[in-house]
């Protein structure tokens, strides 16, 4: 058992989560201790685990203390809620206890204004008298309110609050001196305390209120039928001489005092007494249940700890692995030896070596055998670099990244063109933006804005989606003389999915047919409600050609940025990171990528990794081609120094050294190569077997060469959309750069066509293509590519067949011709009968033959056609069973070209 504990492995990220500290801090400590670890996903042994716990013991104590404080706070809130609930219940109990039903024969002690002499009242034996209302005090002492207790909610004061409540109660008590005299000769009406005249309901109620019975009895002994009830300085009742004591409930007294006017009651004082009394009761109850609360708090802590342990254990049972991992890599992730993995494969009937790549099904099966669940991730996710936590002092306001979206030709590039004061659209083919371009614009107040100009047509759906992932604000451009198009709604959906606020720019308001209100109505139907109509989206009417409203639009964008409080890490010590917006292959400079820096400063000479490639920054240029030495957050720059072409959307991360960058890139390349090799082999075999089974699938093989990676992705997405189940586009190769001999040879071997988008073939490739008679097409606008490929696919579709009726004839006589068979003498009822038409023979409306004509004669001559109203002779091919009255229908099958 001890050996198993020594061999146990711990993941650094799990230890950091347990200690509530940054994984990078734990990683740095482990490296300082001399352990060889690559990332926070690496495993450490039990000894290192103990060192980590010792190093971060203060943090662990702080975490435990924080959890303890939170639990106690939660208990305190629950206890206050319970006390509040009990307070309401006890107030109801006091009302029921101290307000009994009136009983005949009771004597009422009215509380008049202060008087000096006692007031005598004649005895009226038979009249029912209101009872004397007694306020039972809670121990140790409480103020008495005689008549006031009937009007308000009676209560007793706690000992802790006695001093605070004495003064108002005494003032009230001094004004409420009540006295009455009884005749001296009451003739044996002395109450011995054994007769109770209460009603049955009152007796039951008094039996339930045991807590107040003793205090009530104590007060009764202090009253006398002939005395007066007074309150002394301490708020206790004074005794006065009398001939007869008061009974248990004063029920034996047959006297009726003179009824006096009731004094006004101070509701505020009584309410304060009630609250203070209940508070005192609750304090006593709470202190008595302190041990119970401790036990409950301990149980809840144990329950929370059990839940946390269960969640941590569940997380540890999930292993994140790439597809086609080796037994050695799988063993490291599951904290077992490679020997155990290989032995388990043998038992499953798989013979593998330590470095052999396993397929997805095998990895899932092996993980289940060891009690793990396999979660497959991409090669980039498996080797992602965990960024350090940003320090608050390094954060500062950064320029907003704004994406301009909208439909084709609604004026997106013209808007950016006006703001940059340069002719951007002039450099694009057909005035249509073909790339995602990033530009930095300085406003009138000196504040900068970074713009991403995405193409508007639907071929660039993926490019527009990538733009929305890195953007902070979206400017949605809609032409006032047009309407909200499907691509506009698509852009709205992309922005909403990314959680990005939208600022609406209604363009072309200078045109006479402009109708901004119609655009606002259509936008509201699409889920974008402008501020003028009570929505959250800012709106500005502009004219990109004349510059109307451009300044106001930029101010609204900056206002939106201020609301979002956009900040970036401007520390020069932190390792920079950014996103690849676009990449292309230049003949003289090599790979050039447009990078949007998101964190830190990207400097010349920094080693980096981006996707599956790595490199070292050789040069940094702004959007106008001017060389700079560094670039901060939200600044778009062109970077030189990539070893290979990265993909748009890849994350560029600066590494500490060239070796780290190269190792990480090579690891990703190995996983990617293995994945593509396995996938391509499987897809080819599957496609072959599927085509053998179906025999109907037709493919148009295509090789795409373009000037940028973004254009390739847009072309591929557009081509995949126009296929169906019968014909499809098979992209066998795609790449950036000019068309080479290798591309031509691949096209010749695969019977493919080559599409060059804004690129040309070299001399040798051109000669080889002419020799092989290959179809090489060149385009500069994506629309034309999609149209031509769609036409090609439509030509590969099987034509749609439908029947066209030509005419019908009736057999009126049957002739038997030697060596020929039966021939019908017919009359053409309608239409026209053609010699080469298909016919069907109908008898009583039922088809009994379907074929072709053998002979068609008029008189003795063979003819090609016979019109309606004429007679003719007809013979059916290989069929003689014709009778008088049969009908022959002539028809032909017409083929119609199908469209996708």
From Swiss-Prot:
Residues 80-106, 149-169, 221-268 are annotated as: Disordered. Residues 80-95 have a biased composition (Basic and acidic residues). It comes from the Bacteria. Residues 431-435 are annotated as: G2. Its main location: cytoplasm. Residues 543-545 are annotated as: G5. Residues 507-510 are annotated as: G4. PROSITE patterns: G_TR_2, IF2. Residues 253-262 have a biased composition (Basic residues). Keywords: Cytoplasm, GTP-binding, Initiation factor, Nucleotide-binding, Protein biosynthesis. One of its GO terms (cellular component) is cytoplasm. Residues 453-456 are annotated as: G3. Disulfide bonds: none annotated. GTP binds at residues 406-413, 453-457, 507-510. Pfam families: EF-G_D2, GTP_EFTU, GTP_EFTU_D2, IF-2, IF2_N. Residues 397-567 form the tr-type G domain. One of its GO terms (molecular function) is GTP binding. Coiled coil: none annotated. It is found in: Cytoplasm. Belongs to the TRAFAC class translation factor GTPase superfamily. Classic translation factor GTPase family. IF-2 subfamily. One of the essential components for the initiation of protein synthesis. Protects formylmethionyl-tRNA from spontaneous hydrolysis and promotes its binding to the 30S ribosomal subunits. Also involved in the hydrolysis of GTP during the formation of the 70S ribosomal complex. This is Translation initiation factor IF-2. The lineage of its organism: Bacteria, Pseudomonadati, Chlorobiota, Chlorobiia, Chlorobiales.
